[in-house]
Amino acid sequence: MPRVKRGVTARARHKKVLNAAKGYYGARSRIYRVAVQAVTKAGQYAYRDRRQKKRQFRQLWIVRINAAARLNGLSYSRFINGLKKASIEIDRKILSDIAVHDKATFTALVEKAKAALA
């Protein structure tokens, strides 16, 4: 069996990992063995957090809608229920944006939700 020399491929692999670890603190950006661990862990965090980001934004939108709805005398759950009964289909992202930037429109939506609940 012939001898396999890995100089080129090993250097390429090391270079790829060290480039991915650029900007990391200390040995994590300079030493291959440590950099491999750091890059792998970073990938795991990135994968996890891409999913968590969706949850966190939805959570933020709900908190904003709840705060604005309560200023108009309605809880979040009753507000959403009222919108459903009034057959107003606006997603939470847009509702949150309206609540933050356009108080008059949000108040009108709350009034429609209250009317649908009554």
UniProtKB/Swiss-Prot annotation:
Record's keyword annotation contains Ribonucleoprotein: yes
One GO CC term, this protein: ribonucleoprotein complex
Keywords: Ribonucleoprotein, Ribosomal protein, RNA-binding, rRNA-binding
Highest taxon of source: Bacteria
Family assignment from sequence similarity: Belongs to the bacterial ribosomal protein bL20 family.
Purpose: Binds directly to 23S ribosomal RNA and is necessary for the in vitro assembly process of the 50S ribosomal subunit. It is not involved in the protein synthesizing functions of that subunit.
PANTHER family (alphabetical): 39S RIBOSOMAL PROTEIN L20
Name used for this protein in its record: Large ribosomal subunit protein bL20
Lineage, top ranks: Bacteria, Pseudomonadati, Pseudomonadota, Gammaproteobacteria, Aeromonadales
